[in-house]
Amino acid sequence: MREGIHPKYNEVTVKCLCGNTFQTRSTKPEISTEICSACHPFFTGKQKLVDTAGRVERFKKRYGM
């Protein structure tokens, strides 16, 4: 590899809106994110059930089912 053409690869802190922080490596000095594995519903197991009954009824009404 040629020297002087690659960006510096440093340890950085990733900060989530939920308050969770963790270390990783990146060429950016700081990383902010809205959702991380500590607060994402898929990883926490606290998935919200979406009530789709209104959508189903509207579909049936629209297409005469």
Swiss-Prot record:
Gene3D superfamilies for this protein: Ribosomal protein L31
Description of how the protein assembles with itself and partners: Part of the 50S ribosomal subunit.
Regions annotated as coiled coil: none
Protein name: Large ribosomal subunit protein bL31
SUPFAM superfamilies with a match to the protein in the record: L28p-like
MF term (GO), any: structural constituent of ribosome
HAMAP family per UniProt: Ribosomal_bL31_1
